[in-house]
UniProtKB/Swiss-Prot annotation:
It is linked to Monilethrix: A disorder clinically characterized by alopecia and follicular papules. Affected hairs have uniform elliptical nodes of normal thickness and intermittent constrictions, internodes at which the hair easily breaks. Usually only the scalp is involved, but in severe forms, the secondary sexual hair, eyebrows, eyelashes, and nails may also be affected. Erythrokeratodermia variabilis et progressiva 5: A form of erythrokeratodermia variabilis et progressiva, a genodermatosis characterized by the coexistence of two independent skin lesions: transient erythema and hyperkeratosis that is usually localized but occasionally occurs in its generalized form. Clinical presentation varies significantly within a family and from one family to another. Palmoplantar keratoderma is present in around 50% of cases. EKVP5 inheritance is autosomal recessive. The gene is KRT83. This is Keratin, type II cuticular Hb3. It comes from Homo sapiens. There is a cross-link at K217 (Glycyl lysine isopeptide (Lys-Gly) (interchain with G-Cter in SUMO1)). PANTHER family: GATA-TYPE DOMAIN-CONTAINING PROTEIN, KERATIN, TYPE II CUTICULAR HB3. Residues 1-111 are annotated as: Head. Residues 111-422 form the IF rod domain. Residues 419-493 are annotated as: Tail. Signal peptide: none annotated.
Length: 493
């Protein structure tokens, strides 16, 4: 991994120069500050100031890995476009005694193992992130489902309210019908009472008529008996008249026979002429007249009585027939009214049962709707709480993912720097490894907190930027960084 910018400040004079310098290094003490991921190390032992890309060869500065922050390279530099006179510092051509640490390979192996373990942890974190993303999608789907479900069932309350209002209107109509039917029932009961009174009156009239009929029947029977007696008397009188007639005729015949046997002629000298025939004829005529008048009177009286009784029987029969018809009509009306009353009672009971059932169903539906609404509100509240927890977990996972992305980017830069270092090759240098703070120190080791005596290299987390300056480095001392041409405003740590 290469640094974003390189700045070199020499302590020989206050002036500064850029990172690509055309002049050779001057003997002075330099503090080269590198910026690995973390850890601080100081390097001391280099004399002479030089840039990262110097015309007159020098050391090439860079940073890599979590465990080391400085690497020395070979002498390199671009060839000038033209041959010019170059002044070379002879002190730079002397070989350096860097004293390479023999434990560098072990440290590299440990670093590789650490990278493998970190990669395994990273893969586990990736799997966890994927699992949490799936859980997040599942919970988002559940939340959307519950929200849609709430939206779909939010219309239940007005629906139940309308249904309850309809049931109330029906109950009011049923109550109005019940009142109307009650008034009709009262009217029918009053009419029924009137008909009952009329029926009782007609029954009383019928009883009176039957009593009169019985009395008249007795009178008719008496008249018939009297007629029979009179007819018997008439027959007896007729027989008696016939007997007397025959008797008188026989006496007359006997007398005439006696008279014919005797021829005595008696002459009376009187003015009376006894005529028995006239007397008998007169008596007979009188009796005949009496019998005729008696018969005529009896027949006329019998006929009148019969006609009267017939007229009375016909009149009473007609009255009885009308009374029977009225009684039958009243019975039919009573039966019809009784059936209507029973039907009205049945309808009233059915309507009352329907009203009670409707009220019970409405109350049950309302309580069920309230229970469902409470359950939905509880489910929505629980879904909101679960969503809040999932959002927090998702935020934590995203924070972890962000940290892992940062670590991945750091590992990628470390691996790129390691590959570049392996490609360039390793020179014979003395490397002192300090794995406690993640820095590799070449030369004298400056532990964080101590102050270097000579020029040093400090490795601190500064996003991969290399700062070379004359002065002290944090946390060893106060940093004093000067940048050439005003290209840098502050030192990176």
């Amino acid at each position: 991994m290469t640094c974003g910018f390189n700045s070199i400040g020499c302590g020989f004079r206050p002036g500064n120069f850029s990172c690509v310098s055309a002049c050779g290094p001057r003997p002075s003490r330099c503090c080269i500050t590198a910026a690995p991921y973390r850890g601080i190390s100081c390097y001391r032992g280099l004399t002479g100031g030089f840039g990262s890309h110097s015309v007159c060869g020098g050391f090439r500065a860079g940073s890599c890995g979590r465990s080391f922050g400085y690497r020395s390279g070979g002498v390199c530099g671009p060839s000038p476009p033209c041959i010019t006179t170059v002044s070379v510092n002879e002190s730079l051509l002397t070989p350096l005694n860097l004293e390479i640490d023999p434990n560098a390979q072990c440290v590299k192996q440990e670093e590789k193992e650490q990278i493998k373990s970190l990669n395994s942890r990273f893969a586990a974190f990736i799997d966890k992130v994927r699992f949490l993303e799936q859980q997040n999608k599942l919970l988002e789907t559940k939340l959307q489902f519950y929200q849609n479900r709430e939206c779909c069932q939010s219309n239940l309350e007005p629906l139940f309210a309308g249904y309850i209002e309809t049931l109330r209107r029906e109950a009011e109509c049923v109550e109005a019908d019940s009142g109307r039917l009650a008034s009709e029932l009262n009217h029918v009961q009053e009419v029924l009472e009137g008909y009952k009174k009329k029926y009782e009156e007609e029954v009383a009239l019928r009883a009176t008529a039957e009593n009169e009929f019985v009395a008249l029947k007795k009178d008719v029977d008496c008249a018939y008996l009297r007629k029979s007696d009179l007819e018997a008397n008439v027959e007896a009188l007729i027989q008696e008249i016939d007997f007397l007639r025959r008797l008188y005729e026989e006496e007359i015949r006997i007398l005439q026979s006696h008279i014919s046997d005797t021829s005595v002629v008696v002459k009376l000298d009187n003015s009376r002429d006894l005529n028995m025939d006239c007397i008998v004829a007169e008596i007979k005529a009188q009796y005949d007249d009496i019998a005729t008048r008696s018969r005529a009177e009896a027949e006329s009286w019998y006929r009148s009585k019969c006609e009267e009784m017939k007229a009375t029987v016909i009149r009473h029969g007609e009255t009885l027939r009308r009374t029977k018809e009225e009684i039958n009509e009243l019975n039919r009306m009573i039966q019809r009214l009784t059936a209507e009353v029973e039907n009205a009672k049945c309808q009233n009971s059915k309507l009352e049962a329907a009203v009670a059932q409707s009220e019970q169903q409405g109350e049950a539906a309302l309580s069920d709707a309230r229970c469902k609404l409470a359950e939905l509100e509880g489910a929505l509240q629980k879904a909101k709480q679960d969503m809040a927890c999932l959002i927090r977990e998702y935020q934590e996972v995203m924070n972890s993912k962000l940290g892992l992305d940062i670590e991945i980017a750091t590992y990628r830069r470390l691996l790129e720097g390691e590959e570049q270092r392996l490609c360039e090759g390793v020179e014979a240098v003395n490397v002192c490894v300090s794995s406690s703070r993640g820095g590799v120190v070449c030369g004298d080791l400056c532990v964080s907190g101590s102050r270097p005596v000579t020029g040093s290299v400090c490795s601190a987390p500064c996003n991969g930027n290399l700062v070379v300056s004359t002065g002290l480095c944090k946390p060893c001392g106060q940093l004093n960084t000067t940048c050439g041409g005003g290209s840098c405003g502050q030192g990176r740590h």
